[in-house]
Design a protein with these regions (language model features):
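Intrinsically disordered, glycine-rich low-complexity segments
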Residues: 1-6
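Cationic, low-complexity basic patches in intrinsically disordered or flexible, solvent-exposed regions
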Residues: 9
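Short, positively charged and aromatic/hydrophobic N-terminal segments
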Residues: 13-14
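Short, flexible beta-strand-to-coil junctions
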Residues: 17, 88-95, 174-178
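Glycine- and small hydrophobic-rich membrane-insertion segments that are intrinsically disordered
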Residues: 18-56
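Core segments of small alpha/beta cavity-forming domains
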Residues: 47-138
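Surface-exposed, charged secondary-structure patches
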Residues: 118-177
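Short beta-strand edge/turn micro-motifs at domain boundaries
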Residues: 179-215
Length: 216
């Protein structure tokens, strides 16, 4: 396929995936010297159609806020890192809820965890389902009762639509007990360039670990 045909095809896909307001804004920004700059617009299209994934490795799970802040990811300038840290913060929810909430509050930045948010998290862990957190670390599966490999590794991914809204992101964590990645919402604070946690949406039910599965 020639370069010109490729650009036109990409632009066609872009148009199909946008509403009219966003399309008009993109075309306006792509005008150069009174002519439509196809290279710029095609570049945006290609970027939009790509997905991305990052992995983060931790030697140990932080026991408290001080330990969390000591991690390089705690600069919070990378939304993928903030998403990964949200999982680490939940790692203490069973044994030290106060420390877990303190870490979550740090990740939420200008906001704090509301009583309703904390209740929702508690509900997700009902009946001892704290294995949900472990399931997101590499190597954890129902067959090994969600025992993570060491060191702890977390994969965070995006879709072509994860950053559609300016200063907002929906990223995804991958559980060994689910066929589909689970979302987490984040928001950027432009004045600091940091990405903060907005909503944890990845704690839905997953496959039962073998030790608790009466049908295993």
């Amino acid at each position: 396929m020639g370069k010109g045909a490729r650009e036109k095809l990409l632009i066609f896909y872009y148009i199909c995936s946008m509403d009219l307001k966003n399309l008009f804004s993109s075309i306006t920004r792509s005008l150069s010297g009174g002519k439509l700059n196809l290279n710029n617009l095609a570049g945006k299209v290609e970027s939009k159609l790509q997905s991305k994934a990052k992995t983060f490795t931790f030697q140990a799970l932080p026991a408290d806020l001080a330990a969390l802040k000591a991690l390089p990811e705690a600069a919070l300038t990378d939304p993928y890192a903030t998403a990964a840290l949200s999982l680490l913060a939940l790692g203490q929810f069973q044994d030290n809820k106060a420390a877990s909430v303190e870490m979550l509050d740090f990740l939420k930045g200008p906001d704090k965890c509301s009583p309703s948010e904390l209740q929702l998290i508690s509900d997700r862990f009902m009946d001892g389902k704290f294995y949900k957190v472990r399931s997101f670390f590499e190597g954890a599966t129902p067959a090994n009762n969600y025992t993570p490999s060491q060191p702890y590794t977390v994969k965070v991914s995006s879709t072509p639509y994860s950053f559609d809204n300016e200063n907002w992101a929906t990223l995804y964590l991958h559980s060994g007990g689910s066929d589909s990645p689970r979302p987490v919402k984040l928001r950027k604070k432009p004045s600091t360039g940091q990405w903060f946690l907005v909503e944890i949406q990845y704690l839905g039910d997953i496959r039962t670990p073998v030790a608790e599965d009466k049908w295993a």
